[in-house]
C-alpha cells in the first residue's frame, strides 16, 4: 500500500523557531564545540549515538542544581539496570523552586470555576513552612509520605516540601474509596498522611474526612494526618482523633526561612506509583 506524503497541518513561524528552547540548546552545543546541528533530526541522531555527551551537556545547559558527578552513564545490556549520573546528587524541589521571578507559579481553577493564583514567592514560602513542620514531625530522608488528594495548590506544596527533605511522595485520588486507598497506602508505611477536607464531583462537595480517619486508624505507621482546605465549609476533623491537624494549625508555629534542600542520589526514588490493581493488589 502506498501512502502519499502529506504536508503538516501547521508549521511554526521562523521567529517562533528562533525563540524555541531546542534552538537555544543547539546554539549552546555549537558554542561548546560539541556539534553543529542543522535540524531536529540531526540533534536526535547525535543524542542517541553520543548519549553521555548529550546528557552531560543538557545538565549544564539546563543549569541543573546539584552535583553531576564524574560519570554520566553506567550502561547495562538490560536498560532497566543502566544508571544515569550514578555519583550525582540532586533535589527535585530545589530545581522546581529555582525560579528567579515572582510571576505566577500556579493558576488553579476548581470544578466550580473559582480561580486561585499563587506566585513563586508564595509557593516558596508555603514550602518553607511545611518543610519545617514535617521535620518537626520527624520526617527524614527516605521516609514515605502519602496523600489522599485531588489536584490543588496544597498538593503541590506538600509534594515539594516532602521532596525537599529527600523523602518519598505517593498519592491517590480521594474518589478511590477506602479499600483502594488502603491497598496502596498500607504497603508503603507512610509516616505522615495529607488529605484534602473534600473534593468536588459533578457540582457537589464531598467530604474526605471519613476516609482520612479510617486510614489513620488502620495504618499504624501514620503519626500525623494533615487536612488542607478545598471544600468551602470548615471541616470537623475530630473523627480523626489526636493525630489529625488542620493545615493552618500545622504551619502556624513556624516563620518563613531559607529552605535547606537535602540532596539525594540521582537514582534515589522520588515518587511511589502504583499499577491499577485490576489483577490483584496494586504493585
Locations of regions flagged by a protein language model:
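A short N-terminal helical cap/helix-turn-helix that marks the beginning
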Residues: 56-69, 86-107, 267
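Conserved AMP-binding/adenylate-forming core of the ANL superfamily
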Residues: 41-46, 106-160, 177-182, 242-249
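Structural core segment of the AMP-binding/adenylate-forming
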Residues: 164-247
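Conserved pre-ATP/AMP-binding loop-to-beta segment of ANL
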Residues: 102-104, 226-227, 238-274, 281
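N-terminal amphipathic, basic-rich helices that act as targeting or association modules
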Residues: 2-73, 77-80
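AMP-dependent adenylate-forming
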Residues: 32-35, 93-119, 229-235
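Conserved S/T- and glycine-rich ATP-binding loop of Class I adenylate-forming
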Residues: 145, 162, 269, 275-278
Amino acid at each position: 500500500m502506498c501512502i502519499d506524503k502529506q504536508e503538516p497541518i501547521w508549521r511554526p513561524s521562523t521567529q517562533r523557531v528562533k525563540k524555541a528552547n531546542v534552538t537555544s540548546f543547539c546554539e549552546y552545543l555549537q558554542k561548546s564545540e560539541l556539534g553543529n546541528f542543522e535540524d531536529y533530526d540531526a540533534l536526535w541522531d547525535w543524542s542517541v549515538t553520543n548519549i553521555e555527551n548529550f546528557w552531560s551537556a543538557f545538565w549544564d545547559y539546563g543549569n541543573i542544581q546539584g552535583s553531576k558527578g564524574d560519570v554520566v552513564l553506567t550502561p547495562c545490556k538490560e536498560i532497566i539496570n543502566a544508571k544515569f549520573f550514578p555519583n550525582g546528587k540532586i533535589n527535585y524541589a530545589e530545581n522546581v523552586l529555582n525560579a528567579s521571578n515572582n510571576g505566577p507559579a500556579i493558576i488553579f481553577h476548581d470544578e466550580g470555576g473559582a480561580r486561585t493564583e499563587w506566585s513563586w514567592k508564595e509557593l516558596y514560602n508555603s514550602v518553607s513552612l511545611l518543610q519545617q513542620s514535617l521535620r518537626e514531625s520527624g520526617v527524614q530522608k527516605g521516609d514515605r509520605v502519602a496523600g489522599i488528594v485531588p489536584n490543588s495548590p496544597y498538593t503541590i506544596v506538600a509534594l515539594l516540601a516532602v521532596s525537599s527533605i529527600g523523602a518519598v511522595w505517593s498519592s491517590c485520588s480521594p474518589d478511590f474509596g477506602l479499600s483502594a486507598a488502603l491497598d496502596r497506602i498500607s504497603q508503603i508505611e507512610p509516616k505522615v498522611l495529607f488529605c484534602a477536607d473534600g473534593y468536588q464531583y459533578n457540582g457537589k462537595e464531598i467530604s474526605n474526612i471519613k476516609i482520612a480517619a479510617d486510614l489513620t486508624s488502620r495504618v499504624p505507621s501514620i503519626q500525623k494526618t494533615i487536612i488542607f482546605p478545598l471544600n468551602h465549609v470548615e471541616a470537623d476533623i475530630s473523627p480523626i482523633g489526636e493525630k489529625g491537624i488542620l493545615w493552618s494549625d500545622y504551619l502556624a508555629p513556624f516563620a518563613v526561612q531559607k529552605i535547606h534542600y537535602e540532596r539525594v542520589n540521582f537514582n534515589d526514588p522520588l515518587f511511589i506509583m502504583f499499577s491499577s490493581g485490576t489483577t490483584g493488589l496494586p504493585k
